[in-house]
Structure formats: C-alpha cells, structure tokens
Amino acid sequence: MQRLKDKILSEGKYLGKGILKVDSFMNHQIDAHLMKEVGEEFANRFKGLGTTRILTAETSGIAPALSAALTLDVPLVFARKNKPVTMADNPYKEAAQSHTHGKTLELIVSPEYLSSSDRVFILDDFLASAKTIKAL
C-alpha cells in the first residue's frame, strides 16, 4: 500500500471539504497496475472470511474491487446509479449522499446477484463520509 500512498502524495490534490482529487489514477484515468495491487492487498487482508460476493458502487470502486474479486475468486457486484430496463423488478435500493457530487444518488442492486445468504465484502474507492458504504 506504500505505492498507493506515494501516488496520492505525488498526484493527488486536496480540494477542501474532505475531497481528494485522484482522477489521474483512479476516478477518470485508471492506473491498472496500481488498482490491481490495491485490490489484491484488500483481498489478502480479508481472505478466509468466506466472502461470496464483493460489492462496490459504480464507477470508481470497480477497478480495485475487480482485482479483489479475481484474487478471492468470487463475483463482483456493483450498485448501479440508474436502473437499466434489463434489471429485475424490485431491486434493492438505497439513497446515498455523494460527497463529491454534492447530491443524493440512489444505489441499485438486482436481487438476482445478491441474497441474504451471501457473505458480502464491501469495497469502494475512498472513504470520505461513509455514506456510500452505509447505503451499500
């Protein structure tokens, strides 16, 4: 994780109000090797817990969560911000205040891919207010 710390220090920019701009390697452009390393690190720290699914919010959490899912050999489910017409009826929905967008977003997950018997590992990009994590 030292590489992530170094990347944040060299390329991240604090914008105030708890917002860290990391779009050069995570939120807009992705440093795939770094996100692979981050996901593997999280997977290794939490392996052995019987995880059956990894859950994240679109979009920024997908890259590290995908790496963790590959490492743990489990499916990755990401909460959508808009319900596509192809999604099953009665999806799980929860509102979350976006720290970076400054508005409330609805996170939506199909019940086809998440059940009460799953052991879910929630992995998102950065923790600012924990509102996304709570919604997930």
What are these regions (language model features)?
Residues 124-135:
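Active-site/ligand-binding-proximal alpha/beta "capping" segment
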Residues 1-50:
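Active-site-facing substrate-recognition patch
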Residues 63-72:
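Short Gly/Thr/Asp-enriched flexible loops that form oxyanion-binding sites at enzyme active sites
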Residues 58-59, 131:
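Short, well-ordered beta-to-alpha junction loops that form the rim of enzyme active sites
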Residues 50-58:
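Short glycine-rich phosphate-binding loop at a beta-alpha junction
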